[in-house]
């Protein structure tokens, strides 16, 4: 792939990552959300084949709006298929900086042992992997994807009381659903899904993540 195409891809992926962090409630500046391709080139370079930028230069660390101690790394490994050695390096860095959550943007996937290590480290360390292909567009901006809002525990309690429901009576959404993964929604959480409706203005449904 030539430098121009690769630079464009890296810019698109980083832009989606910034939007994802923002949508999860992490502090991201408007400048980062609005960064143009030209600004990305000026900041990071436009010759990936010569290491400008290297993927590792794109590493992001964000802090949550509600709790600045709740921080999350976003790693961009160099190797196309990520192995256990890289995961150990990331984990070491997370331990040193006392950070328990990270996203890993991979080019082609992970080796079986690297995948297993993510499972073994949970729930102490939460590492989520995204294929870069998934991040070339922001799925939540697609016109067919309705608005998703993650509900707080208090909102769920109020919802169940209002409709005299038990949690297990709510319809389900899979934790592996692309939109659920985008928001980092965990099993047991409830999502409010808002769709436009010609008759009611908007139509709201609730889904329990399983």
Swiss-Prot record:
There is a cross-link at residue 81 (Glycyl lysine isopeptide (Lys-Gly) (interchain with G-Cter in SUMO2)). One of its GO terms (cellular component) is RNA polymerase II, core complex. It comes from the Eukaryota. Keywords: Acetylation, DNA-directed RNA polymerase, Host-virus interaction, Isopeptide bond, Nucleus, Transcription, Ubl conjugation. Disulfide bonds: none annotated. The modification N-acetylmethionine is found at residue 1. GO terms for molecular function: DNA binding; DNA-directed RNA polymerase activity. GO terms for biological process: protein stabilization; transcription by RNA polymerase II; transcription elongation by RNA polymerase I; tRNA transcription by RNA polymerase III. It is found in: Nucleus; Nucleus, Nucleolus. InterPro entries: Arch_Rpo5/euc_Rpb5, RNA_pol_Rpb5_N, RNA_pol_Rpb5_N_sf, RNA_pol_subH/Rpb5_C, RNA_pol_subH/Rpb5_CS, RPB5-like_sf. Its main location: nucleus. It holds the Pfam family RNA_pol_Rpb5_N. The keyword Transcription applies. The keyword Plastid does not apply. Component of the RNA polymerase I (Pol I), RNA polymerase II (Pol II) and RNA polymerase III (Pol III) complexes consisting of at least 13, 12 and 17 subunits, respectively. Pol I complex consists of a ten-subunit catalytic core composed of POLR1A/RPA1, POLR1B/RPA2, POLR1C/RPAC1, POLR1D/RPAC2, POLR1H/RPA12, POLR2E/RPABC1, POLR2F/RPABC2, POLR2H/RPABC3, POLR2K/RPABC4 and POLR2L/RPABC5; a mobile stalk subunit POLR1F/RPA43 protruding from the core and additional subunits homologous to general transcription factors POLR1E/RPA49 and POLR1G/RPA34. Belongs to the archaeal Rpo5/eukaryotic RPB5 RNA polymerase subunit family. DNA-dependent RNA polymerase catalyzes the transcription of DNA into RNA using the four ribonucleoside triphosphates as substrates. Common component of RNA polymerases I, II and III which synthesize ribosomal RNA precursors, mRNA precursors and many functional non-coding RNAs, and small RNAs, such as 5S rRNA and tRNAs, respectively. Pol II is the central component of the basal RNA polymerase II transcription machinery. Pols are composed of mobile elements that move relative to each other. This is DNA-directed RNA polymerases I, II, and III subunit RPABC1. It comes from Homo sapiens (Human).
